[in-house]
């Protein structure tokens, strides 16, 4: 099995790295840690780049891409901070992916497209 990234995947990782430097994600991560406030305008930037819902079926507003592409983005964003990567995780391999596969028709119509457009965010709540 060949684990070499193709040119498109290399460009994707490079784009994420460049965006993180340009948008000063390290400083942003520090701000998030200090204040506990997430900058939800970041969702729109992610949506504009097609990072939200990359793996979600095109039928529900996603990109229909392989999971590896999303994982590469999540990995690169997490180098800045797990919180910076969280929306991309949640919209590709986390709760939105679960809704895309197992959700009701209504959930797929109302939740998934909004997340892919950066208009909604989702999370998971757990307890012991």
Protein language model annotation of sequence segments:
Residues 18-21, 117:
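Residue-level marker of structural boundaries
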Residues 1, 23-25:
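Generic N-terminal amphipathic, Lys/Arg-enriched alpha-helix
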Residues 8-19:
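A non-catalytic, amphipathic alpha-helix used as a structural packing/dimerization or gating element
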């Amino acid at each position: 099995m060949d684990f070499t990234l193709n040119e498109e995947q290399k460009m994707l990782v490079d784009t994420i790295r460049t965006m993180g430097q340009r948008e000063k994600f390290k400083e942003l991560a520090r701000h998030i840690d200090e204040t506990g406030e997430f900058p939800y305008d970041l969702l729109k930037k992610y949506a504009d780049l097609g990072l939200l819902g990359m793996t979600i079926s095109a039928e529900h507003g996603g990109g229909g891409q392989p999971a590896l592409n999303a994982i590469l983005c999540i990995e690169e964003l997490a180098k800045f901070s797990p919180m910076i990567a969280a929306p991309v995780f949640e919209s590709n391999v986390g709760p939105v992916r679960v809704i895309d596969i197992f959700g009701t028709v209504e959930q797929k119509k109302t939740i998934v497209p909004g997340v892919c457009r950066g208009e909604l965010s989702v999370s998971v709540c757990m307890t012991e």
